């Protein structure tokens, strides 16, 4: 665009940024999962929660102080709605508590274990539970039961889930009164959004054969500042034992405009090889 050309032709250009979405997940868990719930709106689609097919914004509903006429969230159509993850039926009260606790239960066709869980609640309207119970069972016997207090719509639960074949999530209280429970996305593992403060360096290479006798090869390497020592093999509660190939790595390039805003441009999507080098201090990891 003309604006982009004008900005990039300046003698002194504004800084650029890199953002990487990376984590340790179980890529086979969605295939084994069978999610159910205890009540939902007609356009709710619980089956899409763990496969990444939800819509970027939620529909407007007649919940108090939620119906905002800003054009960002559309009304649900009478036919052919866009299914957008889990949208519960029960609305919380004046104090944010639910009389009937919204429940999402996921049964697995085999035993699974996770280094943690990553939840995406309602980003578009800022709705999330500020009291949230996670229960894991193995053959109907409880092996994990904790109540948390999330403080954001994109929330990582970093406690390890032991071997189990059933997960249950209970919405106990909403951060905003008179709101439904919503869950747009669930990842079986820990997914971090790495920014400039977390990345020490990164590089991208691409090999293309001019005769097209070989498949093009593209590699992306990055070094992160691992202050929590998640990838340190000497950390018994870290993620080292869960590292494997086929972990998705999404990276974007950002350019800062003169008004201070940052435009993010998709750079690439690749998958990890499972290799990770950690410095002697355990504070820097190269992936």
Question: What are these model-predicted stretches?
Answer:
Residues 1-287:
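Assembly/oligomerization scaffold segments
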């Amino acid at each position: 665009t003309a604006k982009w050309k004008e900005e990039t032709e300046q003698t002194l250009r504004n800084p650029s940024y890199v953002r990487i979405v990376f984590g340790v997940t179980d890529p086979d868990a969605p295939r084994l999962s069978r999610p159910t719930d205890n009540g939902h709106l007609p356009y709710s689609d619980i089956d899409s929660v763990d496969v990444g097919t939800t819509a970027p914004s939620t529909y407007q509903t007649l919940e108090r102080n939620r119906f905002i006429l800003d054009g960002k969230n559309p009304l649900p159509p009478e036919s052919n709605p866009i299914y957008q993850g889990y949208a519960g039926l029960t609305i919380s009260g004046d104090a944010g508590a639910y009389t009937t606790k919204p429940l999402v239960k996921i049964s697995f066709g085999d035993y699974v274990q996770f280094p943690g869980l990553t939840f995406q609640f309602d980003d578009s309207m800022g709705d999330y539970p500020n009291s949230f119970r996670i229960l894991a069972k193995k053959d109907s016997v409880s092996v994990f039961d904790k109540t948390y207090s999330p403080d954001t719509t994109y929330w990582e639960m970093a406690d390890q889930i032991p071997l189990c074949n059933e997960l249950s999530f209970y919405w106990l209280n909403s951060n905003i009164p008179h709101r439904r429970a919503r869950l747009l996305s669930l990842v079986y593992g820990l997914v971090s959004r790495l920014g400039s403060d977390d990345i020490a360096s990164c590089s991208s290479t691409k090999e293309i054969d001019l005769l097209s006798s070989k498949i093009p090869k593209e590699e992306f390497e990055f070094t992160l500042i691992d202050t929590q020592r998640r990838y340190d093999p000497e950390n018994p509660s870290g993620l080292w034992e869960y590292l494997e190939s086929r972990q998705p790595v999404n990276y974007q390039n950002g350019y800062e405009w003169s008004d201070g805003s940052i435009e993010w441009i998709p750079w690439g999507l690749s998958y990890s090889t499972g290799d990770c080098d950690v410095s002697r201090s355990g504070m820097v990891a190269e992936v």
